[in-house]
Amino acid sequence: MESNHKSGDGLSGTQKEAALRALVQRTGYSLVQENGQRKYGGPPPGWDTTPPERGCEIFIGKLPRDLFEDELIPLCEKIGKIYEMRMMMDFNGNNRGYAFVTFSNKQEAKNAIKQLNNYEIRNGRLLGVCASVDNCRLFVGGIPKTKKREEILSEMKKVTEGVVDVIVYPSAADKTKNRGFAFVEYESHRAAAMARRRLLPGRIQLWGHPIAVDWAEPEVEVDEDTMSSVKILYVRNLMLSTSEEMIEKEFNSIKPGAVERVKKIRDYAFVHFSNREDAVEAMKALNGKVLDGSPIEVTLAKPVDKDSYVRYTRGTGGRNTMLQEYTYPLSHVYDPTTTYLGAPVFYTPQAYAAIPSLHFPATKGHLSNRALIRTPSVREIYMNVPVGAAGVRGLGGRGYLAYTGLGRGYQVKGDKRQDKLYDLLPGMELTPMNTISLKPQGVKLAPQILEEICQKNNWGQPVYQLHSAIGQDQRQLFLYKVTIPALASQNPAIHPFTPPKLSAYVDEAKRYAAEHTLQTLGIPTEGGDAGTTAPTATSATVFPGYAVPSATAPVSTAQLKQAVTLGQDLAAYTTYEVYPTFAVTTRGDGYGTF
């Protein structure tokens, strides 16, 4: 097979060689192919300054596979000066359907997105163009909750290079502990990519704990003109007990009567001001101040325009979500509970307005930990580009508001959702994607049970990776793959737990994936509202014909197989060191056969 690593002028033996040589001769740019991509320029002739700043690169998707630089370069040249173009190539000499173009400044990049998105490059072939995100931030899960920021920063510098900063958020319930994960900022995308490769499961442990590593969700930038009119503050790291009245009093202390209203949800809040000047003054005065025993972080909330809304909307929501088309201006709110996951905080003027089809009870109710109007953060890339490559999937078309997550006493008018699971059929294309974490309400569900069992047995935090596929009725379906860090580190060849069915709802897919993982591990999920975590080994004596004398006694794989033969509940054995390997290598569903 031909190597995908080429060097030289990048033209010899290529398709449209004559046209490409004519392009290079006309512009004076270099054209070199290496590591599966063909690079045009970078830098261009006569460029004697530093490379363009971050935000100057765009992603161009939906390219016809037989389209090359001789067609794309002239199109981009009309918009601005090209610093560099990188076209992804396959072994056959065709492009992979996408390319990256870096312009000399941000304004040219913005103009290119506006002019080229949905541009008809050929008859019936429309381009998909969005901003490219040069991601320099990694998500690292499985960190002991007792570790401080300085300790995490020091440890990350020991195991990876190019670490610039570490972002750690305190637990909502206990501010002396972290949330079990951190965001690590690197000096460049390359440094972050090298660190991600080094930190893959099984290679590195932190403080003796297996870790989970992935790209952090890239932050969407809001233009300066839009931010200059914002008069709403986002306040995080509040105590759960801190009231809206207490927040309003604190912010009004800077200028009495400046606050219009406060909306607090869990450990964060939005503070609305009558004018921007008062908001900025309060932000400068109160950012970092201790309120009710907790140092708070105060920033300007980020609004989203119509284009950004459409780009992020896929018409999917959480449990009991209804999709409704609206004729008034499009806008939405990102669920701020995910801001600690790296997602931006957005607000909208309609955020706290009642939607016409919502029926509010006579008695006073409350909002749950989700916003009135929200949509999952979906990072799907054109042409199945791997996660973290660039940009967000531009969907175009009409926008919809996906509203969900209302607390007790609120009802959504419409047909009752029919829960249904769909078979994972051969040939279905599963696309990696991220989403807002949906927190179960009221009862303890399978994801909570799985997390508690993993914590109890020091297996690390379960990592959920969301995939989607299009069903036979053209409906978007969802499936989560689950990775347990301890199992992955002990058995690098083992694939993530993959359930056999997809769901039309994201939260249902996550619940089913957790249930499937528990079942694969031999842990029952029935009656799981309390005490469903893995029992200690001392409870093993309740199983007839098999008793484990103490928690320190070794348990062999043969003994566990005997327990399976006797039909015993394996949950009693999950605390033993041999159990993870036994469970994965002996159970079905693609992980082995009994």
UniProtKB/Swiss-Prot annotation:
GO CC annotations, alphabetized: apolipoprotein B mRNA editing enzyme complex; cytoplasm; endoplasmic reticulum; heterochromatin; mRNA editing complex; nucleus
Residue positions, PTM Phosphothreonine: T498
Residues of the RRM domain: 56-134, 136-218, 231-303
Tissue expression profile of the protein: Isoforms 1 and 2 are widely expressed while isoforms 3 and 4 are restricted to liver and small intestine.
Keyword set, alphabetical order: Cytoplasm, Endoplasmic reticulum, mRNA processing, Nucleus, Phosphoprotein, Repeat, RNA-binding
Functional summary from the UniProt entry: Essential component of the apolipoprotein B mRNA editing enzyme complex which is responsible for the postranscriptional editing of a CAA codon for Gln to a UAA codon for stop in APOB mRNA. Binds to APOB mRNA and is probably responsible for docking the catalytic subunit, APOBEC1, to the mRNA to allow it to deaminate its target cytosine. The complex also seems to protect the edited APOB mRNA from nonsense-mediated decay.
Listed PANTHER family: HETEROGENEOUS NUCLEAR RIBONUCLEOPROTEIN
Protein name (record): APOBEC1 complementation factor
Species the sequence originates in: Rattus norvegicus (Rat)
Phylogenetic lineage: Eukaryota, Metazoa, Chordata, Craniata, Vertebrata
